[in-house]
C-alpha cells in the first residue's frame, strides 16, 4: 500500500484499496450521505484507485472529492468493453457529481413504413394493403419497417414531405383511409396518389413504396436510372400519359437532390461529432448522415464539466503508468529499464467528446464511421466495436466532403454554446428547456410559437374560451383571442374545447397548406386525457399533425409542480420536475390563458346578468327560475334564440310563461 495515503480516510477503506486486484473493472466513490461522487472504469483497478490516495491533492477539485470519500464499491469485469458499458450505464443511472454527464435523452424519432397485408381481389381498397409513412417514437414492432434514427422530429417530418412530393405515399391514419369516399386535399396538391379511393393500383403503389425505401437507403441514382428506362419504354409504346407521370416523378426527385447538394457525399451512414468548450460549459454537436443524406444536427450540453475535468485527467495519468521519470532498476533481469515518455495530457474537448461517445452509443446504433473534431482514444473505439460486434472507424482529420461536414458541425457547436451562455438565467433558457423536453426544433427559438387554450364558465353560464400566444420568448398580447361558446350543453368543457379548436384551426389549416399561414409549433390545452382526446379528434378531422398537441394534466392532489404533459400522438406522459425551467414556462403560459379566459368570462357574465334583469321584470320569474333558464341556455342570448316550446321544457316554466318570456325578449 502506498505510504502517502491521506489521513482523513478510515483504515478499513485504505485496506480495501490495498486489497484491490490488478484486473479491469468499475469503481464507485460515495460520500457520508450515501451520494455518489464519481464512477470510473480501469483496466487495472488496483493501480487506478490507488492513484487517488497516494498523495495530498490540496485544494483542487480532486482534493475536495477525495476528502469526501467514505465508502467505495468495485465490480470486476472480464474486459474493457464490459467495463465501458457498465461505467456509462452507472453514470446515467447514478448521476455522480464529478463525472461529465450527458442527459439521458429520450429515444430518437424514426420514420415508420407500415406493413402490407394484401386485400382480397375485387374488394374495396383497405388501409393495410397500402403502407403509410409516419413519424414514430417508441418500441419497435418487427412487422413494420423503420428508418433512422433521425436527430429531431422536424428531420423526420421533412423526410416525410420529400417522400410525399416524390413518391406520393399516404400519411393518413387507417381509420381515415377506410372511411374516405373521395380524395383529400393532398391528392389535389399532388402529395398523395389517393389509394383510399382506388386512384392507384396496389402494384403501382407497391413500386412507389419500394422506390421510397431505396431513396431512404441512399440509392437515388439507381432510382433515377430505372425511372428513365421505364419512361422511355412508355414513350416507345406511345403511352404518353404514363411517360409524363414518370417524367414528373424524375423531375421532383432531381429537384430534391439539387436542393440538397450538400448531401452528395459517398458515405452512407456517418456521425459527425464536434465539441466546443467555453465558460465552464460544453456543447457536443452531433450531425447525422444516413443513406448518404445529411439529416441535420443536434446539440448536447453536458453537466459537471468543470468538476469532472481534473478527475478525468488523473485517470488518464494513471492509465499511462509511470512515464517521463528517471530510469528504474529491474532486479529480476539485472538491468535498467527506461520508461516510455508519457503521452500528452488530453484536452478538455477530447475528454468531453469521449464521455459523449461512451454514453451516447450505449442505446443508439453506432454507424460504421465517426468523424470527430478531436482525437479519440483507440481503446474507446475498440471497446465500442466489441460492444456492438461491428467495425467502427473514428476519423480525426477528414478530407473533402467529410471536412465540409465537420466544419459545419464545429460552427454549429460554437453557435449553440454561445446561445446557451447568452440565454442562461433568462426567458430564453426556459424556451430552450421546453423545446428540448418536447423535441421541438432548436434552430430558431425566437420563432417558436406556442398557442394555449383554456375554458372558463360559472356553472355553465357565459362559457368562454381563450387562446393566448407565446412567441419570441414572450407573450404576444396583440394576438390573444376570446371565443364565445354557443350551442353546447352548459358546463360541457369537452364540447367547448372542440368548438374553439375547430373555429381556430379550420381556416388556418387550409391557409397553411397553401403556404399563406404558419401553424404553431405546440398547441397546449389546459386539461388531461379527455381534453387531449377531443383535440385529437379535431386535428384528425382537419388533417393536422397530432404531434403538435399537449395537455397540461394536474398532478396528484392538484399540487403545483406535479403537472404532467399528455400527448395526442401516443407518447408517454412527461413529468418535467418541480424545478424544471420547462415547467416554469408551461405554467406561465397556462396561467396567462386562464387569466385571459376568466377575465373575459366575468365581463361576459356581467353583461348577461345585466341583461338578465329583463327576465326578473317578467311576472312569475324569480331568482330560481332565472338561474334555471340561464343555466339551460347559457345566457340571455341563448334564451332569446330559443323557441317558446324550448323554453317551456325548463323545469318550473309553464307553456304560458314560456310564451310570455319569448314575447318579452323579442
UniProtKB/Swiss-Prot annotation:
Keywords, alphabetical: Cytoplasm, DNA damage, DNA excision, DNA repair, Excision nuclease, SOS response
Major subcellular site: cytoplasm
Stretches assigned to the GIY-YIG domain: 22-100
Residue stretches making up the UVR domain: 221-256
Compartment(s): Cytoplasm
Keyword Glycosyltransferase (UniProt): no
GO molecular function, one term: DNA binding
Listed NCBIfam families: PRK00558.1-5, uvrC
HAMAP family, per the entry: UvrC
Complex formation: Interacts with UvrB in an incision complex.
Task performed by this protein: The UvrABC repair system catalyzes the recognition and processing of DNA lesions. UvrC both incises the 5' and 3' sides of the lesion. The N-terminal half is responsible for the 3' incision and the C-terminal half is responsible for the 5' incision.
Family note: Belongs to the UvrC family.
Protein name: UvrABC system protein C
Protein's organism: Polaromonas sp. (strain JS666 / ATCC BAA-500)
Lineage: Bacteria, Pseudomonadati, Pseudomonadota, Betaproteobacteria, Burkholderiales
Amino acid at each position: 500500500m502506498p505510504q502517502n495515503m491521506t489521513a482523513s480516510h478510515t483504515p478499513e477503506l485504505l485496506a480495501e484499496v490495498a486489497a484491490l486486484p490488478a484486473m479491469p473493472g468499475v469503481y464507485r466513490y460515495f460520500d457520508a450521505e450515501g451520494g455518489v461522487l464519481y464512477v470510473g472504469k480501469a483496466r487495472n483497478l488496483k493501480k487506478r484507485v490507488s492513484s487517488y490516495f497516494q498523495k495530498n491533492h490540496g485544494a483542487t477539485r480532486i482534493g475536495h472529492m477525495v476528502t469526501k470519500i467514505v465508502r467505495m464499491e468495485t465490480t470486476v469485469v472480464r474486459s474493457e468493453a464490459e467495463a465501458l458499458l457498465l461505467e456509462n450505464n452507472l453514470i446515467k443511472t447514478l448521476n455522480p457529481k464529478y463525472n461529465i454527464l450527458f442527459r439521458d435523452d429520450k429515444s430518437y424519432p424514426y420514420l415508420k413504413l407500415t406493413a402490407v397485408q394484401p386485400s382480397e381481389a375485387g374488394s374495396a381498397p383497405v388501409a393495410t394493403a397500402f403502407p403509410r409513412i409516419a413519424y414514430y417514437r417508441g418500441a419497435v414492432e418487427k412487422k413494420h419497417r423503420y428508418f433512422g434514427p433521425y436527430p429531431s422530429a422536424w428531420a423526420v417530418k421533412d423526410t416525410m414531405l420529400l417522400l410525399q412530393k416524390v413518391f406520393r405515399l399516404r400519411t393518413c391514419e387507417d381509420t381515415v383511409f377506410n372511411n374516405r369516399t373521395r380524395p383529400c386535399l393532398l391528392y389535389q396538391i399532388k402529395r398523395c396518389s389517393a389509394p383510399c379511393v382506388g386512384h392507384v393500383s396496389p402494384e403501382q403503389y407497391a413500386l412507389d413504396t419500394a422506390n421510397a425505401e431505396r431513396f431512404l437507403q441512399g440509392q437515388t441514382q439507381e432510382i433515377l436510372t430505372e425511372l428513365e428506362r421505364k419512361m422511355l419504354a412508355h414513350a416507345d409504346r406511345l403511352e404518353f400519359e404514363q411517360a409524363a407521370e414518370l417524367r414528373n416523378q424524375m423531375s421532383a426527385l432531381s429537384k430534391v437532390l439539387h436542393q440538397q447538394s450538400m448531401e452528395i457525399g459517398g458515405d452512407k451512414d456517418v456521425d459527425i461529432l464536434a465539441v466546443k468548450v467555453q465558460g465552464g460549459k460544453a456543447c457536443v454537436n452531433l450531425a447525422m448522415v444516413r443513406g448518404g443524406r445529411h439529416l441535420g444536427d443536434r446539440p448536447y450540453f453536458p453537466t459537471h464539466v468543470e468538476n469532472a475535468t481534473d478527475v478525468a485527467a488523473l485517470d488518464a495519468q494513471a492509465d499511462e503508468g509511470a512515464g517521463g521519470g528517471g530510469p528504474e532498476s529491474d532486479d529480476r533481469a539485472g538491468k535498467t529499464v527506461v520508461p516510455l515518455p508519457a503521452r500528452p495530457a488530453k484536452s478538455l474537448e477530447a475528454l468531453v467528446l469521449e464521455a459523449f461517445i461512451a454514453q451516447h452509443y450505449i442505446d443508439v446504433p453506432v454507424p460504421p464511421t465517426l468523424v470527430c473534431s478531436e482525437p479519440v482514444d483507440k481503446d474507446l473505439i475498440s471497446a465500442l466495436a466489441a460492444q456492438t460486434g461491428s467495425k467502427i472507424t473514428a476519423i480525426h482529420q477528414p478530407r473533402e466532403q467529410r471536412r465540409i461536414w465537420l466544419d459545419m458541425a464545429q460552427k454549429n457547436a460554437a453557435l449553440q454554446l454561445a446561445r446557451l451562455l447568452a440565454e442562461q438565467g433568462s426567458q430564453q433558457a426556459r424556451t430552450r428547456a421546453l423545446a428540448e423536453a418536447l423535441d421541438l426544433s432548436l434552430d430558431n427559438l425566437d420563432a417558436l410559437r406556442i398557442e394555449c387554450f383554456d375554458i372558463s364558465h360559472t356553472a355553465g353560464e357565459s362559457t368562454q374560451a381563450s387562446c393566448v400566444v407565446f412567441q419570441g420568448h414572450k407573450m404576444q398580447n396583440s394576438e390573444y383571442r376570446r371565443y364565445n361558446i354557443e350551442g353546447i350543453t352548459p358546463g360541457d368543457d369537452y364540447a367547448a374545447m372542440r368548438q374553439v379548436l375547430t373555429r381556430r384551426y379550420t381556416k388556418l389549416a387550409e391557409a397553411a397548406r397553401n403556404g399563406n399561414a404558419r401553424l404553431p409549433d405546440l398547441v397546449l390545452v389546459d386539461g388531461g386525457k379527455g381534453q387531449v382526446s377531443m383535440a385529437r379528434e379535431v386535428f384528425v378531422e382537419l388533417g393536422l399533425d397530432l404531434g403538435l398537441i399537449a395537455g397540461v394534466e394536474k398532478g396528484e392532489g392538484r399540487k403545483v409542480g406535479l403537472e404532467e404533459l399528455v400527448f395526442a400522438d401516443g407518447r408517454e406522459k412527461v413529468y418535467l420536475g418541480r424545478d424544471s425551467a420547462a415547467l416554469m414556462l408551461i405554467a406561465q403560459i397556462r396561467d396567462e390563458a386562464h387569466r385571459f379566459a376568466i377575465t373575459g368570462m366575468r365581463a361576459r357574465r356581467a353583461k348577461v346578468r345585466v341583461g338578465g334583469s329583463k327576465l326578473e321584470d317578467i311576472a312569475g320569474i324569480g331568482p330560481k327560475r332565472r338561474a334555471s333558464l340561464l343555466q339551460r341556455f347559457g345566457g340571455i342570448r341563448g334564451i332569446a334564440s330559443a323557441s317558446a316550446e324550448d323554453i317551456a321544457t325548463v323545469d318550473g316554466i309553464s307553456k304560458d310563461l314560456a310564451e310570455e318570456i319569448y314575447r318579452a325578449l323579442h
